[in-house]
């Protein structure tokens, strides 16, 4: 089973969405910054590392979103943890994504999300973001 951790970054009442590069599996779809949990690493640690690698930013990882964690994909089993995240720096390098967008809760469904991200998007749309904002 592939273990993945993703950061739901909140700033100024908006959520950071990342569009997967066309050549990657799921290319063109939107997701939250994140990636594989490495051996001897917790999902929270993976989020911090992935935010630094993908965005060039340091992050404060907050609590885990209480959403579905296990998915069966055409490529195998996936376990994903989503975490509310605050950025400590704001470089936003385009390393893993072809594009980034800051979306309001009302705009969340204006982009095509990866299937595994949709339960998190549904929860975010119903959440008061002030608790996780700066």
Question: What is the predicted function of each stretch?
Answer:
Residues 37-38, 70-71, 107-109:
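Short histidine/acidic/glycine/proline-rich micro-motifs that form metal-
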Residues 1-16, 36:
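Conserved N-terminal beta-strand and adjoining loop/helix that marks the start
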Residues 20-22, 113:
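Short coil/turn segments
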Residues 32-65, 104:
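The catalytic Nudix box helix
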Residues 58-59, 68-92, 99-101, 105:
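Active-site-adjacent beta-strand/loop module that shapes the phosphate/pyrophosphate-binding cleft
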Residues 27-29, 82, 93-134:
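Nudix hydrolase/Nudix homology domain
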């Amino acid at each position: 089973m592939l273990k993945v951790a993703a950061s739901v970054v909140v700033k100024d009442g908006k959520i950071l969405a990342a569009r997967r590069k066309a050549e990657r599996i799921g290319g063109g779809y939107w997701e939250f910054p994140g990636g594989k949990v490495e051996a001897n690493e917790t999902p929270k640690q993976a989020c911090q590392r992935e935010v630094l690698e993908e965005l060039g930013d340091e992050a404060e990882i907050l609590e885990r979103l209480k959403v579905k964690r296990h998915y069966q994909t055409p490529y195998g089993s996936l376990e994903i943890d989503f975490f509310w995240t605050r950025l400590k720096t704001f470089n936003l390098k385009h390393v893993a994504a072809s594009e980034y967008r800051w979306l309001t809760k009302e705009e969340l469904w204006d982009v095509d999300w990866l299937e595994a991200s949709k339960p998190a998007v549904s929860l975010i749309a119903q959440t008061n973001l002030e608790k996780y904002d700066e």
